[in-house]
Amino acid sequence: MSNNKRLCIMKICITSQGSTLDSQAEERFGRAPFFIIVDTETGSFEALVNQFAGGSGGVGPKAAQLIIAHEVKALVSGMVGGNAREALLAAGIDLYAYRAGGTVRDALDRFNKNALERVA
């Protein structure tokens, strides 16, 4: 991916176990308790509660619609299921893998340094 495209990204989502940048990143997209939405231009963020995390099935596509509604341009997560992946890609959201077991802040730093693998 070209650096020009990365510079255009303004809002990214990082899956999280908590509501702050110092929370542990969550590897599961649909089951993540929180989505941290970061504006890479201003550095501001908001924490969204994933109301679908405890659902019995089909949580990934529902969570994807929540992220899409927030006009995110990239998602940083460990694993994204097939149906959620299709919905996110159809919406033009780039997917990046983060499986380091660190914090949301670490995932964000790696994203900003182009150190994450783009998986789709």
Language-model region placement:
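Short, glycine/polar-rich helix-capping loops at beta-to-alpha or helix-loop-helix junctions
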Residues: 80-86
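Non-catalytic interface/targeting segments
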Residues: 1-58, 62, 69-70, 89-120
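Short acidic/polar active-site loop segments enriched in Thr and Asp
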Residues: 73
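Conserved SAM-binding loop
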Residues: 76-77, 97
